[in-house]
């Protein structure tokens, strides 16, 4: 599974500015989803890879980013 890491509080994606390989995104994806996860900046959001099937990713149901 893959997807954008999401802030549970506000429903927004984790933003990033440096597209492609991005230490911030990689660190955040690993912190949320475990050391086997990967991450990079895609379309100015942190995209996480190698996730378990039940991983919660953006968009959150009933939670719109403001």
Swiss-Prot record:
UniProt key word Secreted: yes
Question: Which residues belong to any copy of the LCN-type CS-alpha/beta domain?
Answer: 1-66
| Name by which UniProt lists this protein | Beta-mammal toxin Cv5
Domain topic, free-text comment: Has the structural arrangement of an alpha-helix connected to antiparallel beta-sheets by disulfide bonds (CS-alpha/beta).
Record function comment: Beta toxins bind voltage-independently at site-4 of sodium channels (Nav) and reduces peak current and shifts the voltage of activation toward more negative potentials thereby affecting sodium channel activation and promoting spontaneous and repetitive firing. This toxin is moderately toxic to mice.
Q: Main site of residence?
A: secreted
Q: Which SUPFAM superfamilies match?
A: Scorpion toxin-like
User: Which PROSITE patterns is this protein grouped with?
Assistant: LCN_CSAB
Which residue spans traverse the membrane? none
* Compartment(s) of residence: Secreted
User: What GO terms in the biological process aspect are recorded for it?
Assistant: defense response
Q: Which family does it belong to?
A: Belongs to the long (4 C-C) scorpion toxin superfamily. Sodium channel inhibitor family. Beta subfamily.
Q: Cross-referenced InterPro entries, in alphabetical order?
A: LCN-type_CS_alpha_beta_dom, Scorpion_toxin-like, Scorpion_toxin-like_sf, Scorpion_toxinL
Query: Which is one Gene Ontology cellular component term of this protein?
Result: extracellular region
At the top level, the lineage of the source is Eukaryota
| Taxonomic source organism | Centruroides villegasi
Keywords assigned:
Disulfide bond, Ion channel impairing toxin, Neurotoxin, Secreted, Toxin, Voltage-gated sodium channel impairing toxin
């Amino acid at each position: 599974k893959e997807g954008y890491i999401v802030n549970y509080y506000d429903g927004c994606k984790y933003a990033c500015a440096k597209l492609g390989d991005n230490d911030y995104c990689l660190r955040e994806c690993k912190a949320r989803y475990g050391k086997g996860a990967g991450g990079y900046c895609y379309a100015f959001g942190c995209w996480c890879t190698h996730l378990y099937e039940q991983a919660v990713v953006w968009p959150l149901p009933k939670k719109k980013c403001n």
